Amino acid sequence: MGLRVNVSAIFMAVLLTLQTPTGQIHWGNLSKIGVVGIGSASYKVMTRSSHQSLVIKLMPNTTLLNNCTRVEIAEYRRLLRTVLEPIRDALNAMTQNIRPVQIVASSRRHKRFAGVVLAGAALGVATAAQITAGIALHQSMLNSQAIDNLRASLETTNQAIEAIRQTGQEMILAVQGVQDYINNELIPSMNQLSCDLIGQKLGLKLLRYYTEILSLFGPSLRDPISAEISIQALSYVLGGDINKVLEKLGYSGGDLLGILESRGIKARITHVDTESYFIVLSIAYPTLSEIKGVIVHRLEGVSYNIGSQEWYTTVPKYVATQGYLISNFDESSCTFMPEGTVCSQNALYPMSPLLQECLRGSTKSCARTLVSGSFGNRFILSQGNLIANCASILCKCYTTGTIINQDPDKILTHIAADHCPVVEVNGVTIQVGSRRYPDAVYLHRIDLGPPISLERLDVGTSLGSAIAKLEDAKELLESSDQILRSMKGLSSTSIVYILIAVCLGGLIGIPALICCCRGRCNKRENKLVCQDQA
């Protein structure tokens, strides 16, 4: 009974082994052709953004300094108008041509909001991005009553950062970049400084703040509707304390660093007030969703030598795995951090079956190309071992002072502590660890993939050759088509007669040929007999 159980257990173990995939990426085989993985991370995608209003109060509260700063405040207002008025006019041109659409319900005779419509004829020319941003602008802008309440609240506040809660609406955060300087520096020193000096100090501070405003909103002058402002740029106007602003906005995401590095938090202008000098921004900050099971791998390649030629394996810089699937990975919209990979959109797209076979360990499926010019990597440290192309660079054992040679039948050299604890390669001294890779990769023990060319001239030449061959094949196909068309012109009875004639000719010709051959053979035999008798 025990033997039967053991046999059953062994059978199940073997069955599970056969059904279990051997793994997504075969790092062992890839290392033989100079490809190693230098990092893996989780995959996160930004999802739908949440919105919060932020007010930048450009004019500080100078009630206690009015007698000393009137000239500076007047000049500062003039400068602000040069920035704010073009933005206000562009916003008004868009919002005045967007109106709500209402429908009348059939059951109850009342109107219900259905959406907004853009008056394209009145607007004239607008890009798709501007139209989309204009609709979003209409949806996020405040109504006139809210603007009046906000203006009244801003005129009375003298805080650098203050939360203003509108009636029946969400909280609005108001920020003034110069107010702290006025409250903490100028007002306490009014008794020690002259009025002129206080005015000069405030004037310099306002001028500096104006340059920051201009650098932040200057690009918006060209396209105020669709221009977006990153939270990093916004932090300069907010006094540099970005954490305090995000905390006031209610953002408590655990992936704040990733969103900041990927510039996922954006701000867009929704209102400009040239009476009280403030700007209303709609800030969109997304949340991150981790795609479970997806791992992003970074690949790095090392060149290797075949005789006197230097090659390297052509593989993507980043790939992604999910279960047994391997996908290409577009890193253009992503930010890489130790905690994971953050992307603003889906970065996965299908990979060719041949490249998947290559990454799964079939080295003969991995394309290779000749090294031309300066190549980045001729050595790399992986798992504490040094993988080096010692045929192209100088490898030296620093411990013993001897040169590490690479035989012609080797394409790469793997150096570990059992061979040389401290290695000097290309002028860099590296201490290596215990062996994780074989000593060397021999050419006769590995199947290399097809050579390809990535140079523009070589690719053009190869394409020209391929086109010429296609033209030759096209001519042959055309000639064969002509033969087929001529065959189509023959009737079926003609084809039958031709076949009968060929068969009759064969029946008559073959016996005649046999008779001729026999006659010649008989003549040769008679000649030989006569010569023997003579």
Curated annotation (Swiss-Prot):
Residues 1-23 form the signal peptide. Residues 139-215 are annotated as: HRA. Residues 113-138 are annotated as: Fusion peptide. Its main location: virion. Disulfide bonds join C334-C343, C358-C366, C390-C395, C397-C420. It is a single-pass type I membrane protein; Single-pass membrane protein. GO terms for biological process: fusion of virus membrane with host plasma membrane; symbiont entry into host cell. Glycans are attached at N29, N61, N67. The keyword Membrane applies. The record marks R112, F113 as: Cleavage. InterPro entries: Fusion_F0_Paramyxovir. Residues 24-487 are extracellular. Residues 138-166, 462-487 form a coiled coil. The chain crosses the membrane at residues 488-518. Gene3D superfamilies: 1.10.287.2480, 6.10.10.110, Head and neck region of the ectodomain of NDV fusion glycoprotein, Newcastle disease virus like domain. Keywords: Cleavage on pair of basic residues, Coiled coil, Disulfide bond, Fusion of virus membrane with host cell membrane, Fusion of virus membrane with host membrane, Glycoprotein, Host cell membrane, Host membrane, Membrane, Signal, Transmembrane, Transmembrane helix, Viral envelope protein, Viral penetration into host cytoplasm, Virion, Virus entry into host cell. Residues 69-95 are annotated as: HRC. Contains 3 heptad repreat regions, HRA, HRB and HRC. Belongs to the paramyxoviruses fusion glycoprotein family. Homotrimer of disulfide-linked F1-F2. Class I viral fusion protein. Under the current model, the protein has at least 3 conformational states: pre-fusion native state, pre-hairpin intermediate state, and post-fusion hairpin state. During viral and plasma cell membrane fusion, the heptad repeat (HR) regions assume a trimer-of-hairpins structure, positioning the fusion peptide in close proximity to the C-terminal region of the ectodomain. The formation of this structure appears to drive apposition and subsequent fusion of viral and plasma cell membranes. This is Fusion glycoprotein F0. The lineage of its organism: Viruses, Riboviria, Orthornavirae, Negarnaviricota, Haploviricotina.
